[in-house]
């Protein structure tokens, strides 16, 4: 594909909240722009609604009474200046013509699939299993895998989900992290008894379960401190040893959260690709995680501690063992920080171009 080709990413609505899935798309957009491609990003208004209903809602929302939290700007991530953004798209005329167009979520799949030919060759970038827990009806996400677009998955578990739906084998495109943002700034060895945990409203992230685990650990490790972080306010009153940072920037994450913690706890039961755990590894935190498909593409028993998702006692014991055995913690954290270095955007970006060009 020549450098002047046009590539368009179609996203769900923009609420200007930090999101791992959005961040991956934005990083690909910047990388493609750096390679000389003409890149645009389109945000749907309500891509799951009928076009007439979505158009009526948009008119009311944008011109009469602002009732939604949709935004027409992006403040938490810096896109390259040449990348064009289109907000609150409803009709195909709202979407620029391109050579390649990506659906980036289940809610955008039908919309992209229905675009006319001049909008580009259609690819479906599948970053997570967006089933009933994401507000979709049973079978909806499986149907999106069978629309006929070229499916791209970021993990082997998602590959299995797509195959189980009856679709053809998807293209595998592993994720990456930004090595300029996350690296070993603070020594692994000299850290306080601090653990970090993501605060999230999505039930599959299981923030509440994570806090229950940490409160059990606190009974045995009285000087335990917790760094809770996320884009949403905590859903419960927190003890004074649990510190919350809202919308932490990358420097705060690298220095004060991941980089100051001995352990990153990830009790999630569903991940497309666990970006936060990878960032934590790169910053020197030992990862204690649920043994789920979204992490095992890069995590194993030598560079992390993987626990059966509902075994609370095992989570507690694993964390206490690491806090009480510095040699083991340092070994796990060091191995993790080394192992994730292979996941770079240049490698993933080149693979993406090969997928677009039908070379793999």
Task: Tell me what each language-model feature is.
Residues 232-255:
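Nucleotide-activated donor-binding/catalytic signature segment of Leloir-type glycosyltransferases, i.e.
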Residues 286-289:
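Short hydrophobic beta-strand element within catalytic cores of glycosyltransferases
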Residues 131-137, 164, 171-191:
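Acidic anion/phosphate-binding donor-loop and adjacent secondary structure
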Residues 8, 152-153, 187-205, 211-218:
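Conserved donor-binding/catalytic core segment of Leloir-type glycosyltransferases
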Residues 301, 305-312, 321-326:
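Conserved acidic donor-binding segment of nucleotide-sugar-dependent glycosyltransferases
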Residues 237, 292-306:
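Short acidic/histidine- and often glycine-rich active-site loop of Leloir-type glycosyltransferases
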Residues 269:
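Aromatic "clamp/platform" in nucleotide-sugar-dependent glycosyltransferases that forms part
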Residues 314, 321, 328-342, 351-354:
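A short, well-ordered alpha-helix in the C-terminal region of glycosyltransferases
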């Amino acid at each position: 594909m020549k450098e002047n080709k046009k590539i368009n990413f179609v996203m769900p609505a923009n609420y200007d909240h930090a999101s791992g899935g959005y961040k991956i798309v934005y990083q690909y957009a910047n990388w493609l722009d750096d390679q000389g491609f003409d890149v645009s990003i389109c945000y749907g208004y309500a891509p799951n609604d009928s076009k007439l209903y979505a158009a009526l809602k948009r008119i009311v929302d944008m011109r009469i009474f602002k009732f939604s939290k949709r935004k027409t700007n992006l403040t938490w991530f810096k896109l390259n200046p040449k990348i064009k953004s289109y907000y609150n798209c409803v009709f195909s005329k709202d979407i620029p013509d391109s050579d390649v167009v990506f659906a980036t979520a289940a809610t955008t799949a039908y919309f992209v699939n229905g675009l006319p030919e001049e909008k580009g060759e259609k690819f479906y970038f599948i970053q997570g299993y967006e089933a009933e827990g994401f507000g979709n009806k049973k079978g909806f996400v499986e149907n999106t895998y069978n629309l006929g677009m070229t499916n791209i998955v970021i993990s082997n578990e998602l590959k299995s989900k797509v195959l189980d739906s009856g679709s053809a084998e998807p293209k595998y495109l592993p994720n990456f992290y930004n090595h300029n943002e996350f690296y070993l700034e603070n020594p692994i060895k000299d850290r306080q008894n601090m653990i970090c945990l993501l605060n999230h409203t999505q039930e599959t992230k299981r923030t509440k379960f994570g806090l229950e685990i940490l409160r059990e650990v606190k009974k045995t490790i009285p000087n335990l401190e917790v760094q809770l972080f996320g884009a949403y306010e905590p859903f419960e009153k927190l003890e004074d040893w649990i510190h919350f940072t809202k919308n932490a920037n990358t420097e705060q994450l690298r220095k004060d959260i991941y980089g100051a913690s001995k352990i990153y706890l990830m009790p999630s039961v569903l991940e497309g690709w666990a970006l936060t755990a990878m960032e934590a590894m790169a910053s020197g935190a030992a990862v204690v995680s649920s043994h789920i498909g979204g992490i095992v593409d890069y995590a194993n028993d030598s560079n992390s501690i993987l626990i059966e998702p509902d075994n609370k006692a095992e989570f507690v014991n694993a964390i206490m063992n690491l806090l009480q055995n510095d040699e083991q913690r340092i070994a796990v954290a060091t191995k993790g920080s080394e192992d994730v270095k292979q996941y770079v955007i240049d490698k993933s970006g080149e693979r993406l171009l090969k997928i677009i060009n039908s070379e793999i």
